[in-house]
């Protein structure tokens, strides 16, 4: 994964939402209980929050991801989701564009700088940006779905989500191109396209079929 991968998904997201109208903004996303307005608001707010992480880290400082923590984050999504489509689009465009400008400032020796997002560093923050933009672009339900996810992204996401595998299960995900395994215990093997298996593991609808009995997964880490 490189900055170019994040730039590509950011460009795709903004192109996908360029024609956003009121009906589209109020339509259902893939996420239960969330309209597209909710997803767009979350993406814009996340982009602003991550911009703060980057800018402060480059100055040698740490800052909270969201002022007020998770409750304030959730309240901001709900209050912002119902804005006019033009406002949603403007907020998203400005926030994502500003975030990408901040990422462009990061030099080769800056990536280990610490941030408070997941108590990690700028390199992990860039990966988080890749995940958030890629997954939620699919969540918008605007013609892009996990079938478009690259193999590199799928393998990264599977590894990030390893804590979702239940205890006492040896999970085997078998695709035509790769075998991914996690956990110890009773073998549970699922087969399908890598994108479908990854979508399921991420808690999203798989575009194609998966064979095998899917276990109940643990929460996101």
Positions of PLM-derived features:
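Active-site-adjacent loops and short helices of periplasmic peptidoglycan-processing enzymes
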Residues: 4, 12, 16, 20-36, ...
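Surface-exposed helix-capping loop/turn segments at secondary-structure junctions
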Residues: 19-25, 104-111
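Alpha-helical scaffold segments that form or flank carboxylate-/histidine-based iron centers
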Residues: 1-5, 24-46, 75-88, 114-132, ...
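Short, helix-capping/interhelical loops that line the mouth of catalytic, cofactor-
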Residues: 1, 48-98, 104, 217-221
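A structural signal for well-ordered alpha-helical segments within the folded catalytic domains
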Residues: 7, 11, 44, 48, ...
């Amino acid at each position: 994964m490189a900055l170019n991968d994040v730039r590509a998904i950011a460009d795709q997201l903004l192109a996908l939402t360029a024609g956003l109208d009121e009906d589209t903004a109020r339509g259902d996303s893939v996420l239960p209980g969330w309209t597209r307005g909710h997803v767009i608001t979350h993406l814009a707010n996340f982009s602003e929050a991550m911009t703060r992480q980057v800018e402060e880290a480059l100055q040698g400082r740490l800052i909270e991801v969201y002022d007020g923590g998770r409750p304030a984050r959730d309240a901001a999504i709900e209050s912002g989701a119902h804005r006019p489509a033009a406002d949603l689009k403007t907020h998203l465009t400005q926030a994502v564009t500003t975030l990408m400008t901040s990422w462009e400032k990061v030099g080769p020796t800056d990536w280990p700088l610490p941030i408070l997002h997941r108590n990690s560093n700028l390199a992990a923050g860039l990966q988080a940006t890749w995940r958030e933009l890629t997954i939620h672009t699919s969540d918008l339900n605007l013609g892009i779905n996990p079938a478009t996810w690259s193999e590199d992204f799928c393998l990264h996401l599977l590894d990030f989500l390893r804590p979702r595998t239940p205890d006492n299960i040896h999970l085997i995900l078998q695709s035509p191109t790769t075998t991914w395994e996690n956990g110890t215990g009773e073998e549970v093997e699922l087969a399908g396209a890598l994108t479908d298996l990854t979508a399921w593991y991420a808690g999203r609808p798989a575009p194609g079929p998966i064979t095998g009995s899917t276990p109940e997964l643990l929460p996101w880490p």
